[in-house]
Curated annotation (Swiss-Prot):
One protein family per Pfam: PsbN
Entry-linked NCBIfam families: PRK13183.1
Homology family: Belongs to the PsbN family.
Annotated TM spans: 7-27
PANTHER family: PROTEIN PSBN (PTHR35326:SF3)
UniProt function note: May play a role in photosystem I and II biogenesis.
Name of the protein: Protein PsbN
InterPro entries in the record: PSII_PsbN (IPR003398)
Organism: Gloeobacter violaceus (strain ATCC 29082 / PCC 7421)
Keywords: Cell inner membrane, Cell membrane, Membrane, Transmembrane, Transmembrane helix
Membrane-topology annotation of the record: Single-pass membrane protein
GO CC annotations on file: plasma membrane
Subcellular location: Cell inner membrane
Predominant subcellular localization, coarse grouping: membrane
Amino acid sequence: MTVAQVFVVGILVALVLITAFAVYTAFGPPSKKLADPFEMHED
């Protein structure tokens, strides 16, 4: 592999990991700690 291919693969792996972490945070067990500001707002 050339240096450019290693660089591109590294960036793609980083993007996949960031996306997986975001989905886990949004829908996994940590989502129980997230607050909904619209539910807390009084009209």
